[in-house]
């Protein structure tokens, strides 16, 4: 089977003519539909790209807003913690000051009570001494003793006083 040059040229002309006829038929009957489908698809892709871009921008705005809210919340939480620490410190200082004042007041009251007790004891001792002195003077006067006897009597009463 050998193909001659004439057959080859004939086949070429036939195939080329068939392709041209096919292209003319496609242009006449199908090209409008194909072009419409391609145009519709192009518009759909363009809309999808625009929607994706809008969604991306919306997501960025939402992210920025969320970040701002998060930052504000962190700032507010820090302020609340700071205020709580400050209030706690003030209350602690107040309690310490009140406790110190109460301790001073109790100490002063105790010192006052001690001074009063001391004063009462001294007063009682003075009263007791004066009573003993009066009693001693009465005994001395009633006993008409000489100086040695008076001295012994005074020493005896002072010893009794020391034991009391």
UniProtKB/Swiss-Prot annotation:
Organism expressing this protein natively: Streptococcus pyogenes serotype M49 (strain NZ131)
Protein family membership: Belongs to the ATPase B chain family.
Subcellular location: Cell membrane
Pfam assignment, any one: ATP-synt_B
Gene Ontology cellular component annotations, sorted alphabetically: plasma membrane; proton-transporting ATP synthase complex
Key words, A-Z: ATP synthesis, Cell membrane, CF(0), Hydrogen ion transport, Ion transport, Membrane, Transmembrane, Transmembrane helix, Transport
InterPro entries, per the entry: ATP_synth_B-like_membr_sf, ATP_synth_b/b'su_bac/chlpt, ATP_synth_F0_bsu_bac, ATP_synthase_B_chain
UniProt-recorded name of the protein: ATP synthase subunit b
